Structures are given as structure tokens and as C-alpha cells.
Amino acid sequence: YQQASSEVRKPAPQPATLRVGVYYSPLFTFRTDLMDVTIERLKNAMPEYAFQVVPLSEFDLTVAAVKHEVDLFVVTSGLYTYLETSGATALAVRKSPQSQDPGKAMGAVFIARADDARITSTSDLRSKRVAALSPQSFAGWIVALGEISNITQYPKNFFGKAYFKDKSGMPIVEAVLNKEVDFGILRTCEFESLVARGLVAPNTIKVVGKKPEDTFACLRSTDLYPDLIFAAQASLSPDIKRRLSAALLSMPMSESGYGWTVGANLSETRHLVERLGYSPTVRMTGPSVMIDRYKYALLIGVLLLAAAVLYSFAVSRTVARRTKKLVEVIDEKSELEKTARIDRERLSQLE
């Protein structure tokens, strides 16, 4: 009886907390458009769990997912293909009102000052200064390099000096308008969002390399890739993943027109990631950027230097060999002259 009483008096176990990592920016409305209602949906579907939203920068979200500091995360398709190698599971793909196909819903757009006559096409971006989010950003950098790979075999060396702002949207537009850079790279639909909020006058900015209009509602300069993916760590049980996925896929569309749908084809994303050697956990700064950018020029310089050293060595050996022969000839001539002089002296004595 006493044992039974003690078991009854034991406190109820605290609910497990599932940490959800999401990208956060003051101008990125993902949380209000979809994430807040998504968390409420998950709480109602799985009341025994507490869901903690962890807002992070894009790079910090990447690190948190890799280090298993979050249990669930919403990431780009590019980052997901990197994480799935360690067992991450896609639960659902975001469905946005801007695209009829969630498999073609995210890309990049090149912007420049409207009065900059130097830049009228994507090829004009060669050697131009650029502002972008970060070298780890899939939609804000890698997708743009994928478009440039249609022009050159070395897309990473195509642009001029790159200025990474660590924040997308307005900081990039301001850098372009203030002539700190020649052009900027935004993620698709960011430009329209800034214009709609009155933060950017549409007649001050032009889109470079605009793709033809199709089922995608926003301006773009690149191909499109799958939308954001809601994923889970490999450490979560299959039952939890199944319940999470069911709750997401059965959720009605939000008031803003966003929702979740079944997974998209990631083959094009994987191809792009492999082709460009996408390493989202490597933060490139300072010398690393310079070395990566000018590695071919450095290689050519090293080869030229090595060739110069070898040529100098060969010339030195040739000069030394010929000098030795010349000295031998001079010595031989001196010896002959000495012998001739002695002979003349003897002949003079005989006379």
C-alpha cells in the first residue's frame, strides 16, 4: 500500500521540448505568414510535447542543425540536401501563393540601379562589385552562381569583389542605391515585398537578366528550386516524425495563403549542390575568400615563378659551362704564347 501511495504521489513527467530552428530577419515574414500557425497546429496535434521556436540567422541555423542543437528545422532545399546525408528527414515542403508548384518556388534575382547603363544583361555582371547575403546562402548566393555557370566554367570567379551583408533585403538594396556595389543578389519575392512595404521605390531599381514570366508570381533571374523544407533530425523516432508530418500536411492554408504539402523533386538541387561544391557550414572570410577567388591566378603565378626559376638555373649552368670552356681556351692560348716566347728566346741566343 505504501509503495502504491508513493507511486501515486510521484510528479507527472514534464513534456518533452522539441526545438524548432527557423531563419529570422526583421523583414522576413515567414513566422507571421506561416510558422506561428504551424506551431499552434503542432501543439494541438501533439499536446504532450512543448514546441520551442529558435529564431536564428541563416548561418547559425545551419550550424544548429548540423550540431543537433535543434530537433526540427525549416531550411532551403540546398541546405536540406546537405543535411540529409546525416539522416535528416523531410516532413513537408512549404506551399506559397507565389508559386503553383512548390518544387519551383525559390530562386534569386539580380538587381542594379535603374540608371546604370553599364548593366543590361547577366553577362554585364562580370567583374562587377556585388552585395549578397552570405556565401553559405543557397537562394542568396549558390543559386546565383548556378545561373552564372551558364556563362562561364568558373562562376565563383565571375563577379568582382563581393560584400556579404549577413542580412538579405534592404541592406543589399541600400548598398546598390548608395553605389557601394554595382549590383545585388536578392532571394525571389524579396524585391516585391520591399516595394509593397514602401521601402523601395520601384523606379530606382531594375532587374537584370529577367526570366520570362510563368506560373511564378515574382521576378527572377535564375532557375527555380523547391521551397522551404520542414525537416527532422535522424534522432527523432519514426512515430514522432509520422505524427509531425501528418499534422503539417493536414493543416489548412494560412490567411496569407501559405501551407505545407508533400515533398518535391530535389534532383536539380542535388545536381547544383554537387556541381558547385556547396559547403554551408564553412564561413569564408578574409584570406579564404581571396584564395578561393584567385586560386587559378595563383596557380598560374606559381607555375610561372617555377618556370622562371628553372630557366634561370638552366641559363646559369649554360653560362658556367661556357665560361669554363672560355677559361680553358684562354689558359691554352697563354700556354702556347709562353711556349712561343721561349722558342723565340732560344732562337735569338743561337743567332
Protein language model features and the residues they cover:
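Short, charged amphipathic alpha-helical "coupling" segments at sensory-output junctions
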Residues: K325-E351
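Immediate post-signal peptide segment of exported/extracytoplasmic ligand-binding proteins
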Residues: Y1-V22, S123-R129, S279-M290
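Acidic, polar ligand-binding/catalytic clefts
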Residues: V63-D124, P135, L145
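Pocket-lining segment of extracytoplasmic ligand-binding domains
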Residues: R129-A131, P135-L236
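Extracytoplasmic small-molecule ligand-binding "clamshell" domains
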Residues: V8-Y82, S86
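Bilobed "Venus flytrap"/periplasmic-binding protein-like clamshell domains
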Residues: P15, R19-K43, G103-E174, C189
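N-terminal membrane insertion elements
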Residues: C218-R220, I240-S334
